[in-house]
């Protein structure tokens, strides 16, 4: 085991604080509408330019191991805030730095670190309740666009496109962000349920111009097995032909004789038919077939529940207004399923999302939920260069997370005002003893830090701005974008409650642990031994010399 270096007390804490400040100072320049960019060097390719706090934090590793420990703990604050709410990483970092700095001053002055921690915790719990009381619902497109705009660093175009996407696919819908080909941002919306399986044979195509299969008001047969014997399908084909409607088959696979017969029937015009493979694999395939069944009002034909393909009746088939199939995707528009059954299935999937511990499973469940409840929107980010594209895509993703958080828990006045108002309401709060009260007060003082930093980044005098905002009440605050004061909600400067709340909780959690640190242990740096000099052989022709 390698030898370790141990540092104690103020020596340890001062090293840790230096690391905290190095990381936080690099991150906090990005805060607010007039925040600056940070350029990150990459080992290959062009450098990345970003205003995303967590992206900056993740790049920072310090040479001194004790300083690095402080930096890594603040990095954890930014990462946690990003995981929880998808935004607010810079705010969380600024809060953590403020609490640690104030806290370590109090420890140096002889306060008990554990009592300080209890005081900080008490203040934060009370402040979170105040934030919830300040919160208002974020339901209409205008406020969603405003939240997106603020989170994308005052880019109104991004806010508007996210609001449009949410309007099209609903609050639960899946919205994905991709790199586009154009210079402008574009929004693509897929109505209905789409899954990534195309037609099994190009002979099913009936729209030659687009290379797609288009079926109007089709019956939909859902089968949880491979179909290779046409005899099993004959009763269904006859029933559908009599009804004079097209048929779409979704099965594990359709092959051999069965597929050939379907193609021949289709080409002769006896029955308009198309077949696709069921989406997903294993248990997920069964679940997705069941989703399609509920959406279209059909039944999954599965031998597991005693249903045989030969005995299928027309009432077992699902129906939809329209189905469009290309070589890669199938889209079912306006399934005729029972609305109550669809809502019940959505509620069931939401329950599974909450219980799931796997990010991958959560993502897949979220996709299924979106497909059932509205559709999928794709925001294609446009930019002139690859460097700009990366920076813009980061901002759009941040804004998307922020708007989801806003819809979930509501919004509070932005620009650091909510934290100042919450702190003002708690000015009478005290701890169980003097040291705890100091902890309470330092946490409330630290809650002014985001507003101070926004002011500094916009070139204003921080103390003047903070006093002006404190003298006001309600939503009155400072708009750093145009250097004016007024009602933050009316000016459209909103922050999601969830983002502000989680930034404060994670910052105080890690910062109060750092305040209570008394010793730090790190490996001693290894001395790199200089390589031995190579043996110098005798010079040629010197053999006879004595």
Curated annotation (Swiss-Prot):
<comment type="similarity">
    <text>Belongs to the chaperonin (HSP60) family.</text>
</comment>
<keyword id="KW-0547">Nucleotide-binding</keyword>
<dbReference type="GO" id="GO:0042026">
    <property type="term" value="P:protein refolding"/>
</dbReference>
<dbReference type="GO" id="GO:0016853">
    <property type="term" value="F:isomerase activity"/>
</dbReference>
<dbReference type="GO" id="GO:0140662">
    <property type="term" value="F:ATP-dependent protein folding chaperone"/>
</dbReference>
<protein>
    <recommendedName>
        <fullName>Chaperonin GroEL</fullName>
        <ecNumber>5.6.1.7</ecNumber>
    </recommendedName>
</protein>
<dbReference type="InterPro" id="IPR018370">
    <property type="entry name" value="Chaperonin_Cpn60_CS"/>
</dbReference>
<dbReference type="InterPro" id="IPR027413">
    <property type="entry name" value="GROEL-like_equatorial_sf"/>
</dbReference>
<dbReference type="GO" id="GO:0005524">
    <property type="term" value="F:ATP binding"/>
</dbReference>
<keyword id="KW-0067">ATP-binding</keyword>
<dbReference type="Pfam" id="PF00118">
    <property type="entry name" value="Cpn60_TCP1"/>
</dbReference>
<dbReference type="InterPro" id="IPR027409">
    <property type="entry name" value="GroEL-like_apical_dom_sf"/>
</dbReference>
<keyword id="KW-0143">Chaperone</keyword>
<dbReference type="GO" id="GO:0051082">
    <property type="term" value="F:unfolded protein binding"/>
</dbReference>
<feature type="binding site">
    <location>
        <position position="415"/>
    </location>
    <ligand>
        <name>ATP</name>
    </ligand>
</feature>
<feature type="binding site">
    <location>
        <begin position="87"/>
        <end position="91"/>
    </location>
    <ligand>
        <name>ATP</name>
    </ligand>
</feature>
<dbReference type="InterPro" id="IPR002423">
    <property type="entry name" value="Cpn60/GroEL/TCP-1"/>
</dbReference>
<dbReference type="GO" id="GO:0005737">
    <property type="term" value="C:cytoplasm"/>
</dbReference>
<keyword id="KW-0413">Isomerase</keyword>
<dbReference type="InterPro" id="IPR027410">
    <property type="entry name" value="TCP-1-like_intermed_sf"/>
</dbReference>
<feature type="binding site">
    <location>
        <begin position="30"/>
        <end position="33"/>
    </location>
    <ligand>
        <name>ATP</name>
    </ligand>
</feature>
<comment type="function">
    <text>Together with its co-chaperonin GroES, plays an essential role in assisting protein folding. The GroEL-GroES system forms a nano-cage that allows encapsulation of the non-native substrate proteins and provides a physical environment optimized to promote and accelerate protein folding.</text>
</comment>
<dbReference type="InterPro" id="IPR001844">
    <property type="entry name" value="Cpn60/GroEL"/>
</dbReference>
<feature type="binding site">
    <location>
        <position position="495"/>
    </location>
    <ligand>
        <name>ATP</name>
    </ligand>
</feature>
<keyword id="KW-0963">Cytoplasm</keyword>
<comment type="subunit">
    <text>Forms a cylinder of 14 subunits composed of two heptameric rings stacked back-to-back. Interacts with the co-chaperonin GroES.</text>
</comment>
<feature type="binding site">
    <location>
        <position position="51"/>
    </location>
    <ligand>
        <name>ATP</name>
    </ligand>
</feature>
